[in-house]
Structures are given as structure tokens and as C-alpha cells.
Amino acid sequence: MAGAAPGAIMDEDYYGSAAEWGDEADGGQQEDDSGEGEDDAEVQQECLHKFSTRDYIMEPSIFNTLKRYFQAGGSPENVIQLLSENYTAVAQTVNLLAEWLIQTGVEPVQVQETVENHLKSLLIKHFDPRKADSIFTEEGETPAWLEQMIAHTTWRDLFYKLAEAHPDCLMLNFTVKLISDAGYQGEITSVSTACQQLEVFSRVLRTSLATILDGGEENLEKNLPEFAKMVCHGEHTYLFAQAMMSVLAQEEQGGSAVRRIAQEVQRFAQEKGHDASQITLALGTAASYPRACQALGAMLSKGALNPADITVLFKMFTSMDPPPVELIRVPAFLDLFMQSLFKPGARINQDHKHKYIHILAYAASVVETWKKNKRVSINKDELKSTSKAVETVHNLCCNENKGASELVAELSTLYQCIRFPVVAMGVLKWVDWTVSEPRYFQLQTDHTPVHLALLDEISTCHQLLHPQVLQLLVKLFETEHSQLDVMEQLELKKTLLDRMVHLLSRGYVLPVVSYIRKCLEKLDTDISLIRYFVTEVLDVIAPPYTSDFVQLFLPILENDSIAGTIKTEGEHDPVTEFIAHCKSNFIMVN
């Protein structure tokens, strides 16, 4: 924050001797003689105008202006007078005030943050991209002050904000590239201007993709949105990123994870209203099967299945030499089957229903073996049983004449069919659509409605569906069921907590406990429900515990509203026992 004193401008070591300036002035005169130089009087006037502006001595361009002024024959006395008279010492005053604050006991770091944040807000408010570009052009090279600024997190953050606000500013675009060159590309994912420069974008893409892969499933929810937003910045960024991920997806090691990320990005684009289906098909194997590609593309673009295109695919996938199964393993395409086959009230042409079921079952169950880009075998062992399970559950789910009591009689059949992953996904979607109806819980008399009981079975059989089950339970838990009275709402929420505890018992521990911890911290959940959850969890767990679990769960028990309020039977006190076990076996991190 220190600034230069006025007298420093005449330092001979910095500017060179008067003779050197004179030589340069002669050179300038020769340039004038050739008709290419500027008029000396105009140059002097322009320079004097700059010298008369406030604190011009602090400007980075002061040295070049002085040089031009003296080359044009300007008088040193005028310079000294103007610079001195217009020196108001804004920077030095800030330094002085900062020193006073520190002397009064304010932490130096806090003072620095205050000054920097105020300066950032002023720069964002008054930034002029045209002026920035002109200064940048005049410099002719990367200014030293810019290289110094990008070395600091605070000022990099400023450049990111400015670049978002002024995407066409050349100076900011260049600065973003400089930041990327300096190795900070991991910070640039949210900067849209980075998407305009291939070199920067490819570097940021590589870093972001590596971060997502290293972070694994548990960090996907945190890392993916920013990445998807960057990739979906424009058609060019989407195509480039998906093409690169398509190549990486062919790798034996980590290829499937990259394919998953590519599919999540495609879903993000679809949710934002972009139709990227043609790019998806072009990068897959569809290009070799133009008729199938046309049928798929039509349905994906419209967001709905239709009998004509389904018939085309059905004929191809029941032929002696069907296309690769990968062709129909497009998540957006499979989602359309969920809506057609499992959504309550969905109408499907009975003459074509078997075709819909066959294609979905084929995509879900057929296993192909490939060697050197050539298919050597197709295993259809599970195709028939999968088709049968899909058809059975479809008939149960979409039969509007079957109420909850009739479904109870079919529970054993449903449980058998749920063992097939594709059916479990369909049932999960069906349960979501059904229980999201406003009057659903109002009409239920059972303590545990059959639809929620099905979620327990899905949690038991399919670890990969745990996140979706929890997502549904959280949605229901946070929904305001105003049609129920207060006691009925509490009972319903206890039932939902029972489902969460079951999910925890099936191995999905940290996400469930994390959610309840957030409920406690946000103070928006009836404390009796938190106590109920704690009691139920303590009933199903036993040592040894992982450190991550203890770090999440112990603070819930130690909360003033929880500790000492849970009733115990006899001498057995699970809360005290758990706390004592943790204190003696773990070091808690605040």
C-alpha cells in the first residue's frame, strides 16, 4: 500500500542523465523533420494536462509522459510545480489511516482486507473497458504491475468478476490467459471469457475434469455444476468438451467415470433447454446407423417416444445383427421410457407396448464383448426375465384401478421384480410421482404407506440408487403437508425418518447424517424429530465407528437440545455410552 513520494520523480538513477534525455529529444526532432513526429507544442500541452490531474505522479504512465514532455522541449519547473500542486496523496493517506487502525488494535490482516475489498468494489463500479484497452495498447507489452497483481488471490478474484461483467474487454481476456499461464486455471471455471480462448479453455477443462475424477462420487454434487456450466457456455465449448470426453471414455482405466460425467453434462444442457441430442449421437456409434440415428434424434429432440420411431428401433434390435447396445444407452432416452412405462396415467398404445418394453430391457440387460472395435459376442441371457419384470411392474403401476390395498397383495411380486435395477429405477420414479400428489398422504391410513415401504426394498437391493432415494425422502420431509394436522405431519415425518435410518443401515451413512446435522443447524426442524432420529440410529449402530461418522454424529448428541433429553429405559443410556466411547477413542476436530 506504500506509494512514491513526489521528489522521487526526478531520481537521475531511474531516468538517466540529462544528456541522455537530450539525445532522445534530438532523435524526436529528427522524427519531426521527417514529417512523422508530433508538434512539440501539442505534445507539451497534452503532457501538461495530464500533469495537472490529481495524483498523476502515482500513475504507472508517469515515466513515459515525462519522457515525451522533455523530448518535446518541456520545462522541468512546470513539471515540478504541477505534480506538486496536484499531489493529494490518496494512497499515502490510506496507508496512514491503515497504520492508525493497526495502532488502535485492529488486526493487520483485517485492515488489509478492508482496504482491498473497498478498492475492489470501486474498481468494479468505475471500470471502463475502453480505457483499460487503450492503456494496455499504449504499454506495448505486459505491464509489470499486472503480473504483480495476478500473483495475489484478491486481485485474481477481481479480474474474474470484471471479466464476467466485460467479456469483450481485450485487456481482461489477456489477463485471464495470463492467470491460466501462471498455473491458476483451476480458479477459472466460472469465467465465461475463458471459454473464448481455446488454449485457456482446454487447460481449464483438463484441470476441472481431473478434479471431478479425483473427487469421486461423494464430491460430484459439489464439483459438477460449475464444470457443466462452463462446458455449456456455448455450442463450441460443448462440442469440444464432449468430443474430448468421448475419446477419454474409450480408455479401460477411468473411461466409465468420464462417460458418466459426459452424460451428467448432457443432462445439465437438456435441463437448461438446449437440444444437444445430435452431438451426443454423432459422438457415439449412431453415425454408423443413420436410420437408428434419425429415429433416436427425433424422439430426443421432441422429448417423447412415439410408436413409429420405436418400431424402427425394435426391428433393428430384434434382427440377427443388431446395432451396438451403446446406441440406446443414452440417459435422456432411457428417461423417456420411465415416463412412458411407469408414470401414473401414462397412455401407451397396447399394440406397441411390447416394443417399448423390449427396447428398455435390451438396453438394461444385454452384455456385449468387444475386441479391437469388433463385437465378438452378445449375451442376452437376462433379456427375457428383465422384459417380464418390466411388463409385470408396468401393469401394476399404471393400473389406475389398483389402490394401495390391492398393491399390498402384490408386494411379494413387486419385491421380486425390484431386484432388476431397471425396474427399481422405474418403481422409484413411480413412487416419486405418486407420493408427490398433494392428496396422497391425506388419503393414507397405514402408518407406513406401501409406496414408502417399496423405497426400503430399493435401498436394500440397489446401492447405486441410494442418492435418489435420499433425494426423494428429503423432498417429502421438507414439503409442507398443510392438508394434515400438526400431529399427522409429525407422524409422517417420523415415518420418513424411519426410511432414512433404513437407508443409513444399508450403508448410506454420511449423507443421511449430514442432512440431519444441517436440519439441526438451520433450526427449521422440530427438535423432537431430531431426538427421534438419534434414538433410532443409536438403536441400530455399534462400534467400531469411523472418524467421519463420529465427527458428524457426535455434535448432534452433544447439542443442548438433545443431550439429556432422550428418555432411557433402566440403567442403559445409549447417548451417554456413545459419547463416552467417542471421547475415549477419537480426537474431535472443531
Swiss-Prot record:
Residues 15-43 are annotated as: Disordered. It comes from Pongo abelii. Residues 21-43 have a biased composition (Acidic residues). Belongs to the NELF-D family. Keywords: Nucleus, Repressor, RNA-binding, Transcription, Transcription regulation. This is Negative elongation factor D. Essential component of the NELF complex, a complex that negatively regulates the elongation of transcription by RNA polymerase II. The NELF complex, which acts via an association with the DSIF complex and causes transcriptional pausing, is counteracted by the P-TEFb kinase complex. One of its GO terms (cellular component) is NELF complex. GO terms for biological process: negative regulation of transcription elongation by RNA polymerase II. The keyword Nucleus applies. It is found in: Nucleus. GO terms for molecular function: RNA binding. The NELF complex is composed of NELFA, NELFB, NELFCD and NELFE; NELFA and NELFCD form a stable subcomplex that binds primarily through NELFCD to the N-terminus of NELFB. Binds RNA which may help to stabilize the NELF complex on nucleic acid. In vitro, the NELFA:NELFCD subcomplex binds to ssDNA and ssRNA in a sequence- and structure-dependent manner. Interacts with ARAF1. Interacts with PCF11. Interacts with NELFB. Interacts with KAT8.
